[in-house]
Amino acid sequence: VGILKEIYGQVLTNPSGANMITGITTTFLTAKSSKTGKNIAVLEIDEASLSHICDYIQPSLFVITNIFRDQMDRYGEIYTTYNMILDAIRKVPTATVLLNGDSPLFYKPAIPNPVQYFGFDLEKGPAKLAHYDTEGILCPDCQSILKYELNTYANLGAYICENCGCKRPDLDYRLTEL
């Protein structure tokens, strides 16, 4: 957001964490006009609210960082959450979608939008099973267990399927140092 503020002067955000429809509405209603005439918003939006919000605003960019099982009590299985997000994105087919390429969930999403990927591009080792819980995420093509040349967290990293050859997509944006 800091870089965008340097360019645009003012960026509308929801820093209080109010990320459902009422919080997003309040964020817009209480916003001050931009002095530069350029308007930009960077909003964190609840997965289940995203589709409804897209009925009212048309984002030019979606950034999807991850989906973990921390919301199972609210939304059920991880793939339910993933499909809610895809349904919302489909409402804005001209918006670019920036996905975490390190997540096997985001491999070849069934959306009409232009897609770009970001991720870690650190030193890789030989492909091996992840050291800890990958949340049951399997190869998106053949449902085999994935191996990782680089495993950054849970199911995130430079994954590869030794059964069918599926692997992390080429990254458009890379983090090369920590």
Report each predicted region and the residues it spans.
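Adenine nucleotide phosphate-binding catalytic loops in nucleotide-utilizing enzymes
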Residues: 116-178
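Phosphate-binding loop of NTP-binding sites
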Residues: 1-119, 127-134, 138
